[in-house]
């Protein structure tokens, strides 16, 4: 059986950051690495789930909404994948992502999609935890200026 592309990445060398993970046709998969892999530090489910709700909503309502294909968590709980059409340059993606992270920090209302009708596990959401994670990731993004 062929090994999938994500297993070909040497996770012992990954640091928190923002990377181009792969390109498939006109879709760029960005690795939004919040935690260093295999250190025992991971995002808990409430944090990941809430970040997913918030960032997915903000990105799909941004100026690049038509180019956002997907945003969701990594199974290893160390970050997220953001899939965007290649017509949007990485620098612009990071700029819009920073805005979405900041908007999450400023959110004072309810978590988007926080009802039984909208979400299959709506009780597992915590805006405070998501704000903490997004604030920490914004610090990581300050040092990002290359994407490979």
Specify the residue positions occupied by each region the protein language model found:
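Active/ligand-binding-proximal structured segments within catalytic/core domains
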Residues: 27-61, 70-71
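Short, intrinsically disordered, mixed-charge
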Residues: 53-64, 99-102, 106
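Active-site-adjacent, His/Asp/Glu-enriched structural segments that form or flank metal-binding
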Residues: 73-143
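Non-catalytic terminal extensions that flank enzyme cores
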Residues: 1-38, 143-147
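Generic alpha-helix signal with a bias toward terminal, lower-confidence helices
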Residues: 19-21, 42-46, 60-63, 83, ...
């Amino acid at each position: 059986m062929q090994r999938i592309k994500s297993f070909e990445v040497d996770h012992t060398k990954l640091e928190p950051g923002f990377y181009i993970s792969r390109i498939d046709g006109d879709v760029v998969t960005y690795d939004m690495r919040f935690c260093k892999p295999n250190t025992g530090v991971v995002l808990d489910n409430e944090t990941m789930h809430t970040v997913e709700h918030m960032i997915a909503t903000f990105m799909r309502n941004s100026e690049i909404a038509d180019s956002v294909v997907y945003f969701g968590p990594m199974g290893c709980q160390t970050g997220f994948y953001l899939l965007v059409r290649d017509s949007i340059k990485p620098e612009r993606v990071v700029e819009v992502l920073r805005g979405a992270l900041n908007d999450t920090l400023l959110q004072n209302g309810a978590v988007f999609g926080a009802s039984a009708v909208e979400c299959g596990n709506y009780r597992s959401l915590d805006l405070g935890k998501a704000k903490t994670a997004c604030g920490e990731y914004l610090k990581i993004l300050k040092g990002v200026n290359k994407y490979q």
